[in-house]
């Protein structure tokens, strides 16, 4: 019988709410999105592709007729954030170094997955749940200027696996 070596101490701890078979597998999700803040209000669609194992992340936020935000990258090559309306085009080696306009701030892809799977995060409340987890989320926080803003997410699609 071959010996198994334990995982390195730095290995991420799997989420309790995620089945063991899908830890690290890609997660595709889509949410209805609503926003209220100092610069106005808006609605749209938030689409995400998340891979915790590689740190790969693609986020697209669309309002009717325009893309508000595109964030893509992975933990090996870094992340790029584009916000055309605000003329933002930023790169950073770590997700935590990028401001996420119109969304709650997260430190990592694992943190974003945890927030969406459990509804746990600073300023986040779960308004409705189903068997898969939070169906409707509400976030209340501050923008980079210290002004109040709110985001509502209504899950439309959640797919785990290849």
List each language-model region with its residue ranges.
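Polar alpha-helical coiled-coil and adjacent low-complexity
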Residues: 16, 24-26, 49, 94-104, ...
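Hydrophobic lipid-interacting interfaces of membrane-associated proteins
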Residues: 32-38, 64-66, 84-87, 144
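One face of beta-strands
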Residues: 27-33, 42-50, 55-61, 77-79, ...
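Short, exposed beta-strand/loop patches in secreted or surface proteins that constitute
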Residues: 47-51, 71-72, 123-130
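Short, solvent-exposed secondary-structure boundary motifs
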Residues: 35-41, 58-64, 113-120
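An acidic-aromatic
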Residues: 54-107
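N-terminal leader/targeting segments and the immediate start of mature chains
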Residues: 1-47, 158-161
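Gly/Pro-enriched, hydrophobic low-complexity segments
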Residues: 113-162
């Amino acid at each position: 019988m071959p010996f198994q070596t334990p995982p390195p101490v730095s290995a991420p701890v799997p989420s309790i709410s995620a089945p063991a078979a899908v830890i690290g597998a890609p997660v595709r999700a889509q949410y209805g999105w609503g926003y209220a803040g100092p610069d106005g209000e808006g609605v749209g669609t938030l689409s995400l592709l998340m891979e915790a194992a590689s740190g790969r992340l693609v986020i697209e936020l669309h309002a009717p007729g325009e893309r508000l935000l595109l964030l893509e990258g992975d933990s090996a090559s870094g992340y790029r954030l584009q916000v055309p309306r605000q003329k933002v085009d930023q790169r950073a080696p770590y997700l935590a170094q990028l401001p996420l306009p119109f969304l709650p701030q997260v430190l990592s892809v694992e943190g974003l997955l945890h927030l969406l799977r459990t509804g746990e995060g600073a300023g986040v409340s779960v308004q409705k749940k189903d068997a898969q987890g939070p169906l409707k989320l509400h976030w209340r926080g501050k923008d980079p200027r210290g002004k109040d803003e709110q985001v509502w997410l209504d899950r439309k699609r959640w797919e785990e696996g290849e």
